[in-house]
Structure formats: structure tokens, C-alpha cells
Amino acid sequence: MYPASPPAGPALHPVPHRARLPQPRCLAEPPRSPAPGPGSTARPPPPPAPGPRPRVAVKMTFRKAYSIKDKLQAIERVKGGERQASVCRDFGVPGGTLRGWLKDEPKLRWFLDQLGGEVGTQRKKMRLANEEEIDRAVYSWFLTLRQHGVPLSGPVIQAQAEAFARQIYGPECTFKASHGWFWRWQKRHGISSQRIYGEAESPVAGPAPVKEEPAQSPGAVLVPDGAPATLPHSEGGYGDEQIYNANVTGLYWRLLPEQASTPGTGDSKEPGGCSRRWRSDRVTVLLAANLTGSHKLKPLVIGQLPDPPSLRHHNQDKFPASYRYSPDAWLSRPLLRGWFFEEFVPGVKRYLRRSCLQQKAVLLVAHPPCPSWATSMPPLEESEETPRQCQPELLGSPEELQTPDGAVRVLFLSKGTSRAHIPAPLEHGVVAAFKHLYKRELLRLAVSCASGSPLDFMRSFVLKDMLYLAGLSWDLVQAGSIERCWLLGLRAAFEPGQQPAHQVEETAEHSRVLSDLTHLAALAYKRLAPEEVAQWLHLDDDGGLPEGCREEVAPAAPPSPASLPSSIGAGEEEEEATEQGGVLVPTAGEAVWGLETALRWLESQDPREVGPLRLVQLRSLITMARRLGGIGPSAVTSDDGV
């Protein structure tokens, strides 16, 4: 028997066992869709599988370091009203960087003040020396010797730096002026080595032994970058904003038209036409500005009071004008020198740094003018009676009035009487405009205090108010007027026959100020003639009196309160008037005490918000209350010599 056969079908063969290998997903083919039938629409192909995108080569941008000059230029453009987006686009910086510059502006200004010079504006990092005192001492010593033509080399400067270190920190100081310190000192102050052929001056002492460094060529000395080897005094090359002019003028700072028109008794009138009793109220004002009028320095007021009561316990740096004392109220040589180094040089350097200009300037100063009655005297050789003290004294030489590096200096204009005479630019209308504006504001104050007598106003108007009034009047002088006066003054040296430009505008402005003065004088003094107002305006046009040409005249004593008219008596009449209609009326002493308390509070506030008008009005009320009540003067309402 045979076994049963399997069912019909494919033959089954044994398959050997194999391990199943996992197939990669990337090789797996997507399932195919069935072929579309005759009545179906075609479907779009599926999107590509997600995967890594191809890399694109990106060029890296390098960060750019901006100098302090660039940062300050951007800051000035934003402060000038330009949009920050436009400034960022021009400089190629994001908005956050520009806002950071604006935030760091005080630090940038402080760094320039510490470093100084044109080199400081080119710095990109605000880093000072580790030993700042030694660095400053060496740099000042270097500038002083280079001004006198003394050649200096690296080893000499290094030895002097170590000597300064021992003087500052004591003999135990371990400071060493290495070659690295000297290299950093050169780069910090912009000093390079140059070969000098012939110095301007020989050294005062014997020639110091000079030992050259290997890096320096034989005969090379150190000079500041951009400066000639001999530092000549007439190097020129100044821009319009770097040329300044200063001029002095006399001013009766609280003299009103009524007092000026009152004739003096006997020979109590000085040649200018004013009574001698008001000579103590005469001050000298120094005005200075650059050619464009964009920088006007604070006026300098010189008076005869050594310690004015109204200026005590006050920070005079906040005043719009400065005050200095002189026995005869004239600009002497020490005063001019002190003003030049204490106010002019720091103010000009701050302005030049703010404007991103080179740190150099020149100040043109006219010789002190003499009144017509003094200049008409015969010279000393022809008249032995002319005192020597009436001869005008020179205020100094250009060598004395200049900075150690010679960047800021003074030049005196010619004083000849022929064509060689160069008039001061500010004499052509600027000084007269300042005085007319000052007297207009003075009359406005007098009209506002018309409730009291003129003596009440003069006692209430103190020297502190005068400084504010002088600063206000100087600010009212337009920059365009100053620039036109410069052109008019300098044209005399080149085109003496040509007419001044913009004469119509100047005449219209002058006429408007004179019209205001005449109107205010008519309001304050109804019986005053226009000729008397004109005399009051031109009373101090002589420009001031030079040294020694004044007589020592003591200020007039103020009238006693008993001699002044009073409508309210003291004693029993005041007690009878204390009660009127059941309302308690304060006494004169209580009223004066309350007004003085209010005055002390008002003076403690910000002077720019208060202004001189309210202070003068309140002092006028106090003076009137004291006069009506028969009370003597007090220390609160100081009269500054009235």
C-alpha cells in the first residue's frame, strides 16, 4: 500500500532559516497609489519628506570701534533735533548702541576733561593712566619745557617721571618708568619723536645730557603731534568759531534818568557829565564772544565793593555774570590774567570739545579806552603837570597770557591813530546794544516798582540783581549782530570806503530799542524830556576810566529815615490805627518781619525760575514799609553801598 498523496498544488520546498535584516527607512519606497480609473481625477504628488536643508555660507561682520569724536557728533545731531533712526543709518549702528552713547555722554565729557587736547577725541577706549597724578605732572612739565624750546628725549622724561613719583608718593615709592610706560604715555598724549634743526630758544639752564634710545634716531626730540618743532607764537590757522574778541565798557548799573538829569552843585560834576555822588555805582563790564556769535562767555563785572552783602553765601558760579573787585572798578592786569586762565580758557576748551573742533583759539583784546577828556591832555613830555598815573597801563604781553602749550593765546589790537589802528569788532554796535538792552530792562523794573520812590527802588536793586540783568541783556544780543559787527570791524583794515552790510536791519533794531526806552521813561517820569533820556543813555559811552585817572571819592551817605517823607507817623498814631473796623492791622515791624521772611524764602529758590523782577519788587516793598514805619535798615535787605 502506498501512502496517500498530498493535494494538488505547488510543491513545498524547505527554506533555510535566515535572520531578517531591518531595512533603512530612507530606502523604503512609499506605497504606490493605484492607477486612476477612467472616471477618476489625477492627484498631486505628495510633498517631499522633511530633512536637513542645505547650508548657506554667511559672511561674518566685524564690530567697528567708534572714536569719541564720532560718538559726540552723533550725540550733538540727536540733541539738535535729528531723528535717531537717521543718525543710526548714517553711522551704521543699531538703535541700542546710539542710546548707550546718549546715556554715556557725561562720561565722555568727563574723559575729555581729564585727558584734554585734540588727541582725546580720537581715542576709542576711555582708559586713563594707572598713575594719573604722575601722568599729569609729566605732561605739564613737558609742555612747559617745549614752550621754551628745551629738547627732550625718552630717558630724560622717564627720569623726570620717577622724580615726580618720589615727590608725590614719598621716597619709598617703587614706581619705575619703563619703556612700556613711556610708550603708552606717548600714545595717550599724541607725542612723537622728530628731528629738530635749530630750536627757537636755547635752554635757560645748561644743556642737559641727552641719551638717545635705540628706537630713536640721533638728534630726535619729542614734540606733540600736529605741532611745529619750535611752537611759534604766530601759527594762525584759526576757524571762525576759534577767534574771540573781548572789550570793556563802563556802566552806571542802577542810575535812573531822573538822577542823571539832576544837576550837581559846584564842581561836583565829573567830565562825563554825571554827579560824583553816583561814581560808586559805576562798574566795568567785560564782554567776550567768538566771530560767529555761537559762543558768548559770561560777562565779567568789576566793581568797587570788595565783599558785596548781596553776594555773600551764594555760589557765584550759578550766576549768569561774574563779579570781581577792583579799588577803582577797572580791569587791571591781575584781573585780566585771572579771568583768562580761570574762565576764558576752560570755557573755550569745553565749547571746542563740544563742537568737535581743534583745541586752539585766539583772543583779540583792545587796549583799555581812555575818555575823551583824558586823551585830549597833552603828552607827558609837553606838560609836566600831567600826572604819570593817568597814562594808560598795558594789561600784559601775549607771552604772559597764553596756555603752556600755546594753543590758547591773547593778541592785543593796534592802538595807533592812523590807518594802522584796528578797531575792536565788538565796538561796532555790540557794546552799545548791550547797554541799551540793559537800561531798557532796568527801566522795566523801575516801572514795575513805581509804587515806591526812586530811592526805594535803588535800595531794593542790589548787585546780585544787576548780575542777572547783565546776563539777560547779553543773552538778548543776537548772534547775527555779533557776526555782522565782526565783518564791519575787520573791513576797516581792507575796505575802508565800503558801506556796512545789513545796515537797514541794524537801524530798525536800534530804533525799536530806543522806542521802548523812550516809552518806559515816559511811563516812569512824565516830566522828563527826550533829550534828558538821550543824555542818560550816552552818559557812560566813554568806555570807562583807566587806572589812576579816578579820584578817590567816598560814596554818598544815604539820607536818614527822618528826612524822608512819611504819611504814617510812629508812636501814638500807629497804635490808634491798629484797629479799623474790628480787623486787627499788623504793625510796621510785623509787616517788615513777614516781608523779610518771604524774601529769604524767595532767594532760596531757583534764580532762573524766580527772576530779578519779583526779588526787586519785594525788596522795594520792604524798603517802603521801613520808610513808612520809621524803621532803620537791616542786614536782610542789603543795599550794596546806596
From Swiss-Prot:
Alphabetically ordered keywords of this record: DNA-binding, Nucleus
Residue ranges occupied by any HTH CENPB-type domain in the UniProt entry: 122-195
Keyword check for DNA-binding: yes
GO CC, alphabetical: nucleus
Region of interest (Disordered), ranges: 1-54, 202-238, 375-400, 548-581
Record family assignment: Belongs to the tigger transposable element derived protein family.
Name of the protein: Tigger transposable element derived 5
Organism: Mus musculus
Classification of source organism: Eukaryota, Metazoa, Chordata, Craniata, Vertebrata
GN (gene name): Tigd5
